[in-house]
């Protein structure tokens, strides 16, 4: 999928703005980042074979700021945390509409010195999965709990709206796939609320997240 030139102009601006931010403003959990060089590409064929997946290069040309990322030790993950984006109701269905939402999330995270979008995967209203931050890097989605923590966000505000059936189905499939890929122990799937002072992932999603730990 190719974005319109105006989108890429805007993305280029965000990239330049992120690079211009002073190092003193980098979040503590990203300050020790050591990820120079090209962004590693992880093999996600095990996901693409099972469900709709859009790779990162399909929705944005903005590259991460590697100096602000932390390389995942041997790509090992021991837990999964589920989120909602929280700030607005989202029912975007077309890929173009979803890309605009993803642009907003990415731009916000760059302005916060995350070095890239903080989540590893994003699930839209139709159940499509979008690759966010490479799994080669620890995420930036739960303050103080990002190491070995794989981050998945569902687009929407689930204090104010209910997740779609397609989103919930995709959440179940995706968590199952990554849990088995990384041998994440049963009982190690959390809502953001379990790890921090927040309502995320919202009252309409959190009970569904809790049930994930009961699945094989």
Label for each model-derived stretch:
Residues 102-106, 110, 116-134, 149-151:
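Cell-envelope/glycan interface and biosynthesis
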